[in-house]
Amino acid sequence: MRAERLSPLLALGLLVAGIRSVHCLPENVVVKDRHRRVDGHTLASSNTDFAFSLYKQLALKDPNKNVMFSPLSVSMALAFLSLGARGPTLTEILEGLKFNPTEIQETQIHQGFQHLLQALNRPRNQLQLSVGNAMFVQEELKLLDKFIEDARVLYSSEAFPTNFRDPEAAKSLINDYVKNKTQGKIEELFKDLSPRTELVLVNYVYFKAQWKTRFDPKHTEQAEFHVSDNKTVEVPMMTLDLETPYFRDEELGCTLVELTYTSNDSALFILPDKGKMQDLEAKLTPEMLTRWRNSLQPRRIHELYLPKFSIKSNYELNDTLSQMGIKKIFTDADLSGITGTADLVVSQVVHGAALDVDEEGTEGAAATGIGIERTFLRIIVRVNRPFLIAVVLKDTQSIIFLGKVTNPSEA
């Protein structure tokens, strides 16, 4: 007899929205508690490893489709869920998140996420970033006091009584909450909910920043983007002449350009040589990302051509997570740390993401002469074929977005 047919259901919603322009926050904000960032850094390696593992699974499903997701959102939601997991279920989640339970204690992991969450949500100059968690609980469901307290203290989770026996009303309540938290970028996280649902855990991320050196819309023109050998589309192509971190990786056959936001966070664009995308994807590792970031050097790019795009994605992650070793939560889960009984299973894990990249931003005082190594070669970078993008928050080294743009003309 299959457990998932009998057990009350739990659903995870994970979402992120990101866009590119921002209104500056007051410049006299003082950042305190520097030690918290150190705790955040201890998670960076595992989170990056998880990010690339999840990316590879999503990219394999359809190599010709756009991929866009937030590793930070997915990993934080699963860590939140693990608060209530016990035994092999807990071990699977932690190992799936690329932690070694024999080397790091569960409490250290949760405290690390707690400090990371606090670091991400502190007031920042020139960046709007909001990360949060919420629980939607069936009205008569009794949660353990310890789970409620840990969810509040470690994951800053809000809790909302919900009547899942009216699934349409419950869906509207959750989707409206998500829409509000993401400034309208994610409108329908859940397309349906079972009336047997008992609990929904939601993690959201909202990111809004502007380029340090903006693209001039007057220079944006329609240009060809080569989706594949036999398919070309017309897209708005932005162009810029600037000095920015750049690296040509001859070993892997790719070009890297890092564009910074006014907040000094950055977007790393990785452009494989023609026919090299799958080879590059197979070699994505945390060590490779570290090597790339250490190899980036300021260069004058005389002509940078970058497509303007707006991509939304929605994923059901049940099968994907199972392939990554996180299986028990969907079948014979032990989530007794939530209610005291082992009768909950996860019915669905959904993830929504939205990322806009366009010309908007302020022209910041980018360093143009100090520490800049000039080159006599004229560097031209045309991002006119499928590429990878990683948006990285500088102080915590968190990958907030990771994706592949195969066709910028597809929303």
UniProtKB/Swiss-Prot annotation:
Domain of life: Eukaryota
Residue(s) at site: Reactive bond: L377, R378
Residues listed as glycosylation sites in the UniProt record: N180, N230, N264, N318
Compartments where found: Cytoplasmic vesicle, Secretory vesicle, Chromaffin granule; Secreted
Keywords: Cytoplasmic vesicle, Glycoprotein, Protease inhibitor, Secreted, Serine protease inhibitor, Signal
Alphabetical list of Pfam families matching this protein: Serpin (PF00079)
Residue intervals passing through the bilayer: none
Signal peptide residue numbers: 1-24
Disulfide bridge partners, by residue number: none
Molecular function terms from GO: serine-type endopeptidase inhibitor activity
GO cellular component, one term: cytoplasmic vesicle
Oligomer status and interactors: Homodimer.
Annotated function: Serine protease inhibitor.
Family: Belongs to the serpin family.
Protein name: Serpin A3-4
